[in-house]
């Protein structure tokens, strides 16, 4: 590879773009010039020529000196924090704080700063340093600067140094089900699992088996077709939503909406449900489009029913709470029904929330916009009800929300938040052991510079929404709050690079919002991770994630040796498997290798991969025998092996244990195969039993296998831990 120009290397360094990285095999990889130029362009920095790079370096320096205050100051409670101000050289600088509660504090102390002044277009700018006191309360405050006739203000965010676990989990462990909600149909749902099903699953697992939470797939909003069907088929992946702040109306239970009782012709709603249920019974995959077509028709009928005065007040309060973001989301949904679901192809007057034609469209389509606002209100009420029921049933946490990494590039958030999302690149992951071609998630990443300029408000709102009706949140690929793999448009995932984020700021804001909500934060920290990152998460009191198949003893013994239970992390959520692998029964049989081989995803010979899978299985069976969870001699059947593996989890010190619902009922089919789109029915696989026959929610409640596994994990989490 051609040596990179020093100016390009320096420019990349200033903007947090890696010029080299260590891959999953430990090999040092140099990033190409084309990738660096594309990443800089996504940050608004032209860097194709030497002149452009030199101009950009000069502009970056000038921008630093022209800014009176930092864009945002994020600090930890109990620590003094120093920051710099820029004023005309020699001019006084009066600095004070205004706290979130309106209180003013003046004890912002100036300290020595001997930096020489800077000539900014003939005006000499001086730099002074100030220190914020260590005793500031948690919250969102402001620091103000006055110098002569000039004034400036910046956000100060004081975050918890340590989040940890809430009092309700003090000294205790908890177990819960990990569920892909869409796959869990009931006899009352509309061909797809919904929020009433979620509430009932929580009630059963808590009251019958002492579960402390239900971890559910991201419930984020998807792009849904309108009456004219202008949109493409519904994107099945819950990890590629149109919006992460708002919720998917597919998860509504129509019959749980209070106004339904006042609908004059309720028989039509019943017929719609019956028809879609019969259609679903004939398929071996989830048909979201048919489910939504029926549900949308019913919801339109209910939306027209007059509401009581009290209900109108509740709706108005919801709209006030959600503000401009709700209006933008509902507007995008109505626009997508009219012009299609790719806002880049809309008329130019509609391609931005503030564009000239948007307000006129809203006026002319007020009912369509209100329908989508109303749907979010109903979702908010049903989510609140599910969480309330879970807690009343005895759960310590209730619903554990799942926050996806990003959003669809053509969707609502990409339209509404386009000023803080990078254009011309997508987020993904470099090659690793299980995805050797890398991954492109087709999502525009946050721009770290714009997040700071906007005081992290879009990110704050996202975390607040995730925790509003949840006792915990799992953040998918939490490593993306430290650095994220950016892939230039049109390039393969192997041709990306890492871009740094202010992890102190982003993790701090997550911790602050979780502290205010009394919630737990679980970071999915699998894959290629810098060694210090897991230590940092632990020091901030966030839980990590451990998957049994990935927990290997890399310090002692040969490769592939299982990590002994007592050496697992305490501050983590542990499970046997994940949605990107087959359920445990399938994994034990080597299904993950055969599936990837059939899809052309292997980079090694299939026999070598199968032999590796057999060796992994043998190593874990030997470990289970070593600790007495399997008897010597006869080979265990699938159910016995799965039960023993989850009992092994119970011997780890992990504070949270997760049981995949697919494992509880003996399912074998993979929910998602990374590296594929239409080649495999990702996120469209309904829950089935070991015989491959569909399993409804009501069947789970009486299933012997599910009860046995639940009780085994319950016993493990309630027994004394010798390693504590």
Curated annotation (Swiss-Prot):
Its main location: cytoplasm. Gene3D superfamilies: Glycosidases. This is 4-alpha-glucanotransferase. Keywords: Carbohydrate metabolism, Cytoplasm, Glycosyltransferase, Transferase. Pfam families: Glyco_hydro_77 (PF02446), MalQ_N (PF21226). The keyword Repeat does not apply. It comes from Mycobacterium tuberculosis (strain CDC 1551 / Oshkosh). InterPro entries: Glyco_hydro_77, Glycoside_hydrolase_SF, MalQ_N. It is found in: Cytoplasm. GO terms for biological process: carbohydrate metabolic process. NCBIfam families: malQ. The gene is malQ. GO terms for cellular component: cytoplasm. Its EC number is 2.4.1.25. Signal peptide: none annotated. Belongs to the disproportionating enzyme family. It is an enzyme of class 2 (transferase). GO terms for molecular function: 4-alpha-glucanotransferase activity. It catalyses: Transfers a segment of a (1->4)-alpha-D-glucan to a new position in an acceptor, which may be glucose or a (1->4)-alpha-D-glucan.
């Amino acid at each position: 590879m051609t040596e990179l120009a020093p100016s390009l290397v320096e420019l990349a360094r200033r903007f947090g773009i890696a010029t080299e990285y260590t891959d999953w095999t430990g090999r040092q990889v140099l990033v190409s010039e084309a990738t660096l130029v594309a990443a800089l362009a996504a940050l608004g920095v032209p860097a194709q020529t030497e002149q452009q790079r030199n101009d950009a370096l000069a502009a970056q320096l000038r921008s630093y000196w022209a800014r009176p205050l930092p864009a945002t100051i994020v600090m930890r409670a109990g620590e003094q924090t120093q920051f710099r101000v820029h004023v005309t050289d020699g001019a006084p600088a009066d600095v004070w704080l205004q706290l979130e509660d309106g209180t003013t504090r003046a004890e912002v102390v100036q300290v020595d700063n001997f930096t020489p002044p800077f000539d900014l277009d003939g005006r000499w700018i001086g730099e002074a340093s100030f220190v914020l006191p260590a005793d500031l309360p948690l919250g969102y405050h402001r620091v103000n600067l006055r110098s002569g006739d000039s004034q400036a203000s910046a956000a100060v965010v004081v975050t918890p140094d340590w989040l940890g676990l809430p009092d309700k989990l003090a000294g205790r462990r908890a177990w819960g089900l990990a569920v892909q909600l869409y796959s869990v149909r009931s006899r009352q749902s509309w061909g797809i699992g919904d929020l009433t099903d979620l509430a009932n699953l929580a009630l059963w697992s808590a009251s019958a088996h002492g579960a402390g939470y239900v971890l559910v797939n991201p419930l984020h909003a998807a792009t849904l077709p309108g009456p004219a069907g202008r949109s493409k088929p519904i994107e099945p992946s819950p990890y590629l939503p149109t919006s992460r702040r708002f919720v998917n109306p597919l998860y509504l239970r129509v019959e749980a909406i209070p106004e339904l009782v006042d609908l004059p012709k309720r028989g039509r709603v019943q017929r719609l449900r019956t028809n879609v249920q019969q259609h679903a019974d004939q398929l071996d995959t989830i048909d979201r489009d048919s489910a939504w077509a029926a549900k949308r028709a019913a919801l339109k009928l209910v939306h027209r029913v007059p509401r009581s005065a009290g209900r109108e007040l509740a709706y108005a309060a919801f709209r006030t709470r959600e503000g401009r973001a709700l209006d933008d989301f509902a507007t995008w949904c109505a626009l997508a029904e009219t012009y299609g679901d790719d806002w880049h192809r809309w008329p130019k007057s509609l391609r931005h929330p503030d564009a000239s034609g948007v307000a006129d469209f809203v006026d002319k389509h007020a009912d369509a916009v209100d329908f989508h606002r109303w749907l979010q209100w109903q979702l908010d009420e049903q989510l609140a009800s599910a969480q309330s029921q879970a807690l009343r049933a005895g759960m310590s946490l209730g619903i554990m929300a799942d926050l996806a990494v990003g959003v669809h590039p053509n969707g609502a958030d990409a339209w509404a938040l386009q000023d803080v999302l990078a254009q011309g690149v997508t987020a993904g992951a470099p090659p690793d052991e299980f995805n050797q071609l890398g991954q492109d998630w087709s999502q525009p990443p946050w721009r770290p510079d714009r997040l700071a300029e906007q005081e992290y408000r879009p990110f704050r709102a996202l975390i607040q929404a995730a925790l509003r009706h949840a006792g915990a949140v799992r953040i998918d690929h939490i490593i993306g709050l430290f650095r994220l793999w950016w892939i230039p448009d049109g390039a393969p995932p192997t041709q990306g690079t890492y871009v740094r984020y202010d992890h102190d700021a982003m993790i701090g804001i997550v911790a602050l919002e979780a502290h205010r909500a009394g919630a737990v934060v679980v970071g999915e920290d699998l894959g290629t991770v810098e060694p210090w990152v897991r230590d940092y998460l632990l020091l901030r009191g966030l839980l990590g994630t451990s998957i049994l198949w990935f927990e290997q003893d890399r310090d002692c013994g040969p490769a592939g040796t299982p990590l002994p239970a007592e050496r697992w992390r305490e501050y983590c959520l542990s499970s046997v498997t994940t949605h990107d692998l087959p359920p445990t029964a399938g994994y034990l049989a080597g299904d993950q290798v055969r599936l990837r081989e059939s899809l052309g995803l292997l980079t090694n010979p299939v026999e070598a991969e199968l032999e590796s899978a057999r060796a992994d299985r043998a190593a874990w069976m030997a470990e289970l025998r070593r600790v007495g969870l399997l008897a010597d001699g006869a080979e265990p059947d699938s159910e016995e092996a799965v039960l023993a593996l989850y009992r092994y989890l119970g011997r780890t010190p992990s504070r949270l244990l997760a049981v995949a619902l697919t494992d509880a009922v003996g399912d074998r089919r993979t929910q998602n195969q990374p590296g594929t789109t239409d080649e495999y029915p990702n996120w469209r696989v309904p829950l089935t039993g070991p015989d491959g026959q569909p399993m409804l929610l009501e069947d789970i409640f009486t299933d012997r296998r599910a009860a046995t596994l639940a009780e085994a994990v319950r016993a493990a989490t309630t027994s004394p831990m010798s390693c504590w």
